[in-house]
Amino acid sequence: PVMRMYVSELQNSPKPQRLWYFGNCFRYERPQRGRFREFWQIGCELIGGSHPDSEAEAIALADSMCRSVGIRGDIHIGYLGLIRSLLARIAAQHRPAIMRMIDKKERADLTQMLDEIGCSHIGLLELLDQKGRGALDRAEEIVRELEGPGKRTQPVQAVADQASQTARAEKPAGRLSARQGRQVGAELDLQEFRETVDLLQAYGVDCTIDFEIVRGLEYYSGTVFEIYAEGLG
């Protein structure tokens, strides 16, 4: 409904547009134990902003809302673009099952399946095991492997340092991210993900980098996050 309203009423309005919604929703599925077809959902949309800035603003908003009602949660943030790049090395018929195993944290089944299809070498399990900055360091190594030799025009760390310095020096809201001299492809996406993490630090939001966060729906293709709160999940 929010995007329908934007398309019909707000397309010509100045960008970025910040919209929010709150209401009951329904899942189109059969009744089953422990899962309700009707549920309440609150959300926001930031349309027309730059990726790292918009993503950091939305995550910081979620953190602020939780804190305002007394919820202290741990934020885990991941990047599906890298996971999908790794899965591109695997036959298409195996990808849905692998995504489901990652989502459900069925590590033993995932390990067995990767062994059976001869894909235990692609670095997926190692990446999922890493958390925090170590996960991002390993992700950058994987990006270099995906790109192959001689395809890098600028080191990831150089752009990351530039983004980090800018994030510390300027206020997060409304700033333009430093994206000078980048190449198109997996590296650019990972650079933007690192910028998002740096911007969250500038907002004062603590987060854990966790590439084990995945979503099965196809429109989830970039940064994803979850907030875990004791007693809530």
Question: Each PLM stretch: what is its role?
Answer:
Residues 1-72, 113-233:
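Positively charged, Gly/Ser-enriched RNA/tRNA-binding surfaces
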Residues 72-78:
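Cytochrome P450
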Residues 91-114, 119, 229-232:
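Acidic, His- and aromatic-enriched active-site or binding-groove loops in soluble protein domains
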